[in-house]
């Protein structure tokens, strides 16, 4: 059975790269969400195995940390693991501090440790 991943705030090319990475290692369906409002609505009404949030949302360049914080503060939706997509280690640390799993950067897709990190939720 396919695992479902919600991708929040990626541009179309980056979502394509994320889908190629994920589908080369796991049986996944990628669902795109452009912004915080849409993401929160989808999380409340659909089941996901993993949520990835871009550091800066492509639709309006808002802060992905706000999305993560909104998810983590809502007990009705904070059970799904969330990962930040960012190449910046300081951003990853901040995301972990507010409740996310340690994520990955767009330049790290094929690193074995990233495959293993994501695999905890998609195998």
Predicted regions and their residues:
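Conserved phosphotransfer cores of two-component systems
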Residues: 44-46, 72-78, 98
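Short hydrophobic/Thr-rich beta-strand motif most characteristic of the beta2 strand and flanking loop
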Residues: 27-35
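Acidic, metal-coordinating helix/loop segments flanking the phosphotransfer/catalytic sites
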Residues: 34-50, 56-58
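C-terminal output helix
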Residues: 108-118
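Conserved acidic segment of CheY-like receiver
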Residues: 2-13, 18-22, 51
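A short, hydrophobic beta-strand element within the central beta-sheet of small alpha/beta folds
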Residues: 78-89
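Conserved phosphotransfer microenvironments
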Residues: 52-71
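Alpha4 helix (beta4-alpha4-beta5 surface) of REC/receiver domains from two-component response regulators
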Residues: 63, 87-104
